[in-house]
């Protein structure tokens, strides 16, 4: 969208030329110049970036899991007694063959995720849309090169996301590590499940009269998330 001003300015120039045999007025000329310059400035200040090359000897595969802990009620939706804790966990790992595979996008569900990201940063809702054109260095796969490899679990910060540190995960995976990174539901900026159900951010404690105990409960939820992930990894490995 950064080139939208340029895209519209070109047909406008043609229309002005067809309707007027006389030179453009100063106002019209200034408007067209403004449109052209705006497009180039936007494309320079908000570029479609690329993640750095992981640099290791392995290609990087990725797979996203949706896991539900049926033994644990959802702490953040206590009003719904039928809601169990569910999380999205993405893994990055070394793979051999990437033939006929396309790199995965940097962010999934950008049409949903973008507006939430913009609101958190106080930006216009359309601004993160360009991230839809950013790809990662990871390829969708379930075939790790070996079954036994060192495993790391990365837990993001409050309002964070598993997506924010992908360059580091790809760096590690290309060097022989398997990295699991969850979105801690309701702690993350936004968690989007495969059916597009949303877990929004609900971990704000500013001004809460019992903030210490509330945060303690949230940290316990995260601890149980990690324990649950370890159990799921063991199941995958058997």
Kindly label every feature range from the protein language model:
Residues 41-152:
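Domain-level recognition of soluble alpha/beta enzyme cores
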Residues 186-188, 192-238:
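Alpha/beta-hydrolase active-site loop
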Residues 91, 172, 226:
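Divalent metal-coordination and catalytic microenvironments
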């Amino acid at each position: 969208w950064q080139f939208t001003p340029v895209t519209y300015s070109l047909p406008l120039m043609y229309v002005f030329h067809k309707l007027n045999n006389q030179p453009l007025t100063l106002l019209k000329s200034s408007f067209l110049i403004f449109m052209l310059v705006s497009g180039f400035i936007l494309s320079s200040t908000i570029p479609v970036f690329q993640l750095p090359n992981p640099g290791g000897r392995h290609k990087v595969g990725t797979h996203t899991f949706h896991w539900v802990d049926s033994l644990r009620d959802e702490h953040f939706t206590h009003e719904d007694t039928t809601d169990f804790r569910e999380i999205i966990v993405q893994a990055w790992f070394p793979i051999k063959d990437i033939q006929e595979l396309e790199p995965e996008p940097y962010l999934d569900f950008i049409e949903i995720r973008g507006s939430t990201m913009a609101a958190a940063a106080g930006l216009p809702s359309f601004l993160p849309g360009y991230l839809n054109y950013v790809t990662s260095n990871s390829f969708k796969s379930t075939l790790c090169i070996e079954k036994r490899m060192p495993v790391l679990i990365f837990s993001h910060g409050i309002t964070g996301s598993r997506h924010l540190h992908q360059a580091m995960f790809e760096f590690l995976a290309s060097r022989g590590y398997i990295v699991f990174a969850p979105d801690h539901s309701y702690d993350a900026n936004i968690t989007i499940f495969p059916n597009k159900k949303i877990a929004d951010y609900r971990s704000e404690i500013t001004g809460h009269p019992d903030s210490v105990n509330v945060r303690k409960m949230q940290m316990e939820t995260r601890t149980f998330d990690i324990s649950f992930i370890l159990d799921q990894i063991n199941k995958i490995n058997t």
